Amino acid sequence: MAKKKERAVNVSGKPRHSLDVNRANDKKGAGGGAGGGGGGRSAATVRRLKMYKMRPLRDRGGKILKHDLQSKELPNTRIEPDRRWFGNTRVVNQKELEFFREELQSRLSNNYNVILKERKLPLSLLQDHQKQARAHLLDTEPFEHAFGPKGKRKRPKLMALDYESLLKKADDSQGAFEDKHATAKLLKEEEEDGLRDLVRHTMFEKGQSKRIWGELYKVIDSSDVVVQVLDARDPMGTRCYHLEKHLKENAKHKHLVFLLNKCDLVPAWATKGWLRTLSKDYPTLAFHASINSSFGKGSLLSVLRQFARLKSDKQAISVGFVGYPNVGKSSVINTLRSKSVCKVAPIPGETKVWQYITLTKRIFLIDCPGVVYQNNDSETDIVLKGVVRVTNLADASEHIGEVLRRVKKEHLKRAYKIEDWVDDNDFLVQLSKTTGKLLRGGEPDLTTTAKMVLHDWQRGKIPFFVPPPQQGEDSPSETAEPVDKSDEEGVSSDRTAAAMKAIAGIISSQQQMNVPCQKEFGVTNEDSEVAEQSE
């Protein structure tokens, strides 16, 4: 067979084929020439063009003889007849599975326990799935009476035999729907009492919009640990039971932690009582958000590091901070970072959308807007919880009566230098004259004065707190006075020592209950000792 001659490279100015290296590019500025234009094709261009013409070499029968840019077919192989290739990798009998299921349910009832290596557990076998309700058609009417030669009806009878049973079934389903949705039930109770607010300003529905709830669910879905921030002055009033129910039903693998913020506004015995009460449900920490002088920062960092170690199968964990508006979620994040990374303000609704903050390489923080779950709170309760901005209130004086009822008279005398008053209107008139809030003609400006009082209420200048239930031996009598920030400058050394002793009592009680706690008051070092959770 004659040897095939190789095509010689054309050195003339006009190449004969497109694969010639010396062929110039058509476009100016392209090609492999040194000058950028008029040069020959580069080696990469030649290889690319040659690739377009490459095909596998086949014989007359179509069998591939030589592969070119094709995957080679592996020859038929024989698998070694070993039991390890075909046997079960993990085997468990019914008795062991039942024992493990009971043990798992008993351990998961305690919110301080954490499942390790969730991906290796057959959770689908350990959880009892709810079965769908079946319509027992054969109990209502036999099969032969509905179909076949003896059939008497064109359709089989359903659960409702007549209109009365159908109406009863509809009423039952409506009752179940109303029980599930608390708002409908509350409206029904209001109608029975004969009182119902037909018109309510949209301002009192802040934190309940679809957009805000969407932000909350995005934060929950993205978080491995959810920290619910509560106001230490009214923890139960700022607690969202709907969120806890949602996590139990739909996200059992996520962990919930309570954070009692603003504990500097309440006495130590009240903080201790709320820690005992809330720790029965979820891990609870006391916290005071401040970049310079914080309390509880070491405990919270220790808990977050512990969760990061427990989630060792993940590269990083996300911690979402949720709660009512104006409870200090953004301030807590700024305290953990020791600098201002989130926009904060003493007014509700400052955070509009969720925000990712990097704490460490393995811990990320998520700031969430304040969310309010619709309940039977009145407009005054909504204002006093800090959900509504005081500057937007049309008539702020109508909420002062509740403030005078909740706060002791001696604290108001000490704060506003007013000796006595008859009602809320008289109180506002005297305060307007004292502070110089007057209109033309010397008339008192009641609206501006009322807004000033509500601002002082929301910012903690007026001492107020809800006492914890089942007060123990450490709690004082009912005549105990709340913390008054106006006397902080004149506190003697004896009272300071007593306060430090009470805080030490809180820390010791947390250690006895296996609650993560901060070892020293005022410690902000991130390398503090890790608190251990109960197993």
UniProtKB/Swiss-Prot annotation:
GO CC aspect terms: nucleolus
Positions of region (G5): 290-292
G4: region residues: 261-264
Biased composition (Basic and acidic residues): 17-29
GO molecular function annotations of the record: GTP binding; hydrolase activity
This protein's UniProt keywords: GTP-binding, Hydrolase, Nucleotide-binding, Nucleus
Main location: nucleus
Highest taxon of the lineage: Eukaryota
Residue intervals of the CP-type G domain: 213-374
SUPFAM superfamilies, per the entry: P-loop containing nucleoside triphosphate hydrolases
Residue ranges of the region described as Disordered: 1-42, 464-495
Region G1, residue ranges: 323-330
Annotated stretches, region: G3: 367-370
InterPro entries, sorted: G_CP_dom, GNL2_CP_dom, GTP-bd, GTP-bd_ortho_bundle_sf, NOG2_N_dom, P-loop_NTPase, TRAFAC_YlqF/YawG_RiboMat
Annotated family: Belongs to the TRAFAC class YlqF/YawG GTPase family. RsgA subfamily.
PANTHER family: GTP-BINDING PROTEIN-RELATED (PTHR11089), NUCLEOLAR GTP-BINDING PROTEIN 2 (PTHR11089:SF9)
Functional description taken from the UniProt entry: GTPase involved in pre-60S ribosomal subunit maturation.
Protein name: Nuclear/nucleolar GTPase 2
